[in-house]
Amino acid sequence: MLRIIHTADIHLGARHDDLGEQAAAQRERQFAAFKAAIDLAIAEKADLFLIAGDLFDSNVQPRRSVERVAAEIKRLTVARIRTVIIPGTHDVFDRVSIYRAYDLATMAGATAGDGMVTVLDPDHASVHLASLDLLVLGQVFDTKRAPHSPLHGMGPAVVAQGATPGARAPTWRVGLVHGSISIPGKTEHDDVVITADEIAASGLDYLALGHW
């Protein structure tokens, strides 16, 4: 049985200017929640830890904060739990992205080609985890407003990037998306929206969502 822990929208490093002197305490509570999710993944012997966007509240973070986050993810690496991350709308993959500034995978103990920590980007939006017989399909934009549905191109016929033609498809297909499900009267002005029909047509075994 495949065990997945999925989280999103932790917004680490949020300024919380409106909280005044309580801002630092709130940031620590958010970090504690992130640590608790990793504790759970290790305790449950999860196979895969997914972060569906907005791990960070913005792309401007001090190095010590990124190192602190990487140290937590490294606990998953040591436990042989694979981690896949997509940028969101707060930590968007633009030209000043935090994921361009820092090699989070290496900082978290992953080595080239081991697949232990993967940060998806617009040019590498999927990853085949052969040891889990699983394909993670992501959608990463370089702007906060999506130019098309985050589920675009995730149909059942999609194969892993670089897959050998004719190779057997992985047993599991997991989507990793930062976006909202369309709700009449609530999501008309949202930047990233998907519909229930798009989800059904994707043929995904599991869809890990973030945003709200």
Language model feature labels by segment:
Residues M1-E67, T164:
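N-terminal active-site segment of His-dependent metallophosphoesterases
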Residues L48, N59-W212:
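His/Asp/Glu-rich metal-coordinating catalytic cores
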